[in-house]
Amino acid sequence: MAQLEGYYFSAALSCTFLVSCLLFSAFSRALREPYMDEIFHLPQAQRYCEGRFSLSQWDPMITTLPGLYLVSVGVVKPASWILGWSEHVVCSIGMLRFVNLLFSVGNFYLLYLLFRKIQPRNKASSSIQRILSTLTLAVFPTLYFFNFLYYTEAGSVFFTLFAYLMCLYGNHRTSALLGFCGFMFRQTNIIWAAFCAGHIIAQKCSEAWKTELQKKKEERLPPAKGPLSELRRVLQFLLMYSMSLKNLSMLFLLTWPYMLLLLAFFVFVVVNGGIVVGDRSSHEACLHFPQLFYFFSFTAFFSFPHLLSPTKVKTFLSLVWKRRVQFSVITLVSVFLVWKFTYVHKYLLADNRHYTFYVWKRVFQRHEIVKYLLVPAYMFAGWAVADSLKSKSIFWNLMFFVCLVASTVPQKLLEFRYFILPYIIYRLNMPLPPISRLVCELGCYAVVNFLTFYIFLNKTFQWSDSHDIQRFMW
């Protein structure tokens, strides 16, 4: 059975890589010059490729650290030595973009290993389900598209997933080192390094919580009634747990590599004067709470075969009626957050090359009341996401939610790329769906990818004040 699964995996990876190479060829023919953010990334990588590493050579418009450029040089330079290629060839636009295609292969393998580690291997979860889940996430439209451009997404996801995998296997020093590599690609990846530390803490809290519940059961104490009572009991437990010096010392011994990484991050923020390097004018942090609602909607859209069904809607409505007071409070809080904390970034309104421009224009700008009318949909999407993670412990869910808030809420710009990592982490930890739903999901992703690539490559346009060819993209 294991050998058969290996054949399935090899076939899926080979087919995906073949299709990716064909798409890469189409991209290379259509895009012979840097496009969008590549106008900053590619020249910087080429300067590094030429050995010009001084700070005076740094483009101040770049807001991320040089992880992508350093790894690219580490990949393409040995190729020039081994194959005898000229510097002009190995530092070309095509070769640098190809680095991300290599990252996509690594991401495919890491996703497969993570599914094998996270999902219990029993008769209920077949090898076909794991392979299909891996294939589906590997071609997840928002991530897959950026495998063909010189952006930080593919490498950022690679090192973050690698760090998560090492954490699950207990190699925490390696995990923290890989987390640092992820941070070098995108500063906000420090949150997912903290997520790895949180995973350990959640695991230990779950073990202690089970012991506590068993003790209460033996003492025949009444169980908690209702979610608020349960939450209060969990918070009391966490308070008591954190007051124990023995528990704190044990957690520190397990998480010290991550603590060192977080300390280094705080030193960086103090010395740098903020999390962003380079141009900070367009990357202002704020409390943009509706970003959570956008993420839940994004997740419901891309996971609709698993989250949307008449049964789920009926269950949700029944729960709303049963706990109408609690849901009324949640609704009022949500409306208040939408009212007071909705921000519209200047890029969202100015750049008509991104799909988010059209989502905002054709949905949110139709009428001022639309953003409030969407609150019930946000609530259903949030409940559906939480319900699909009920197999995880309450401590894991709390830790994931904290990291989700930290990675989305401070972002002023509505940008689907910011949702890639939290979505992948969510999808990895959701129980393996039935094969029929996975096939449906994969088919939908294939259609979305086809449309995205077709529109990007064929439906070009020009601005009135520029002769440059513009393209639609995520």
Curated annotation (Swiss-Prot):
It is found in: Endoplasmic reticulum membrane. Its main location: endoplasmic reticulum. It catalyses: an alpha-D-Glc-(1->3)-alpha-D-Glc-(1->3)-alpha-D-Man-(1->2)-alpha-D-Man-(1->2)-alpha-D-Man-(1->3)-[alpha-D-Man-(1->2)-alpha-D-Man-(1->3)-[alpha-D-Man-(1->2)-alpha-D-Man-(1->6)]-alpha-D-Man-(1->6)]-beta-D-Man-(1->4)-beta-D-GlcNAc-(1->4)-alpha-D-GlcNAc-diphospho-di-trans,poly-cis-dolichol + a di-trans,poly-cis-dolichyl beta-D-glucosyl phosphate = a alpha-D-Glc-(1->2)-alpha-D-Glc-(1->3)-alpha-D-Glc-(1->3)-alpha-D-Man-(1->2)-alpha-D-Man-(1->2)-alpha-D-Man-(1->3)-[alpha-D-Man-(1->2)-alpha-D-Man-(1->3)-[alpha-D-Man-(1->2)-alpha-D-Man-(1->6)]-alpha-D-Man-(1->6)]-beta-D-Man-(1->4)-beta-D-GlcNAc-(1->4)-alpha-D-GlcNAc-diphospho-di-trans,poly-cis-dolichol + a di-trans,poly-cis-dolichyl phosphate + H(+). Signal peptide: none annotated. Highly expressed in brain, skeletal muscle, uterus, small intestine and liver. Moderately expressed in lung and kidney. Weakly expressed in heart and stomach. It comes from the Eukaryota. It is an enzyme of class 2 (transferase). Residues 1-6, 86-97, 148-150, 197-256, 305-317, 387-392, 458-473 are cytoplasmic. The chain crosses the membrane at residues 7-27, 65-85, 98-118, 127-147, 151-171, 176-196, 257-277, 284-304, 318-338, 366-386, 393-413, 437-457. It is a multi-pass membrane protein. One of its GO terms (biological process) is potassium ion transmembrane transport. Keywords: Endoplasmic reticulum, Glycosyltransferase, Membrane, Transferase, Transmembrane, Transmembrane helix. One of its GO terms (cellular component) is endoplasmic reticulum membrane. Belongs to the ALG10 glucosyltransferase family. Dol-P-Glc:Glc(2)Man(9)GlcNAc(2)-PP-Dol alpha-1,2-glucosyltransferase that operates in the biosynthetic pathway of dolichol-linked oligosaccharides, the glycan precursors employed in protein asparagine (N)-glycosylation. The assembly of dolichol-linked oligosaccharides begins on the cytosolic side of the endoplasmic reticulum membrane and finishes in its lumen. The sequential addition of sugars to dolichol pyrophosphate produces dolichol-linked oligosaccharides containing fourteen sugars, including two GlcNAcs, nine mannoses and three glucoses. PANTHER family: ALPHA-1,2-GLUCOSYLTRANSFERASE ALG10 (PTHR12989), DOL-P-GLC:GLC(2)MAN(9)GLCNAC(2)-PP-DOL ALPHA-1,2-GLUCOSYLTRANSFERASE-RELATED (PTHR12989:SF10). Interacts with KCNH1; may regulate KCNH1, possibly by regulating its N-glycosylation. Interacts with KCNH2; may reduce KCNH2 sensitivity to classic proarrhythmic drug blockade, possibly by regulating its N-glycosylation. This is Dol-P-Glc:Glc(2)Man(9)GlcNAc(2)-PP-Dol alpha-1,2-glucosyltransferase.
